[in-house]
Amino acid sequence: MTNQLIYKGKAKDIYSTKDENVIRTVYKDQATMLNGARKETIDGKGALNNQISSLIFEKLNKAGVATHYIEQISKNEQLNKKVDIIPLEVVLRNVTAGSFSKRFGVEEGRVLETPIVEFYYKNDDLNDPFINDEHVKFLGIVNDEEIAYLKGETRRINELLKCWFAQIGLNLIDFKLEFGFDQEGTIILADEFSPDNCRLWDKNGNHMDKDVFRRDLGNLTDVYQVVLEKLIAL
């Protein structure tokens, strides 16, 4: 059925289209933290996230990364390939920050000699727990070969993103990716890439990401607008 709500999320809603293999993603003006425990409506946020993510995914597509992104169709909407989402959040850390610093008792801002890839089990009831490769296999999420692919592809994407953000004066601290199986059973990058799911610091150490909301550091949309303008100029 066309235009049927398939999924209602914290930051995005997903609808069916005339093509059973294509979905319409609508970005919402909502910011959340602590797995939705704190919610706030922020005018214009959805459009900024959509435009930033569209620009990043277009560049990833051109760089040869297989993604679900098809095209942006309005300021807060885009068309994507339908995928079966793998219930893992794949996190890559270039610099210590956030929950990593709290978990291991290290200060924020330490550059990691080798970027660290982590898995988190996508399960709201369990608060998305940190898990390892053995847990992933025990839960039957993906196999050894697919785990290796997820890690390798995440590292490849990191190298591309670090380079692009460095060109616009931003340091990519860490980020979260989601992947899914397309209709042919191939793993492709899904979800979004925006300051909602990454940390970006400018040369002065200012936060240019969702930490502005988490830590009450200022106006979130002003910061996202700066990131968007920098990416447009790239």
Swiss-Prot record:
Pathway field: Purine metabolism; IMP biosynthesis via de novo pathway; 5-amino-1-(5-phospho-D-ribosyl)imidazole-4-carboxamide from 5-amino-1-(5-phospho-D-ribosyl)imidazole-4-carboxylate: step 1/2
Protein keywords: ATP-binding, Ligase, Nucleotide-binding, Purine biosynthesis
Uppermost EC category: ligase
InterPro entries in the record: SAICAR_synt/ADE2_N, SAICAR_synt_PurC, SAICAR_synth, SAICAR_synthetase, SAICAR_synthetase_CS
Domain of life: Bacteria
Disulfide bonds: none
Reactions accelerated catalytically: 5-amino-1-(5-phospho-D-ribosyl)imidazole-4-carboxylate + L-aspartate + ATP = (2S)-2-[5-amino-1-(5-phospho-beta-D-ribosyl)imidazole-4-carboxamido]succinate + ADP + phosphate + 2 H(+)
GO molecular function per UniProt: ATP binding; phosphoribosylaminoimidazolesuccinocarboxamide synthase activity
EC number per UniProt: 6.3.2.6
Short name of one Pfam family: SAICAR_synt
UniProt-listed GO biological process terms: 'de novo' IMP biosynthetic process; cobalamin biosynthetic process
Keyword ATP-binding appears in the UniProt entry: yes
Family: Belongs to the SAICAR synthetase family.
Xref: HAMAP family: SAICAR_synth (MF_00137)
Name assigned to this protein: Phosphoribosylaminoimidazole-succinocarboxamide synthase
Biological source species: Streptococcus pyogenes serotype M3 (strain ATCC BAA-595 / MGAS315)
Classification of source organism: Bacteria, Bacillati, Bacillota, Bacilli, Lactobacillales
Gene name per UniProt: purC
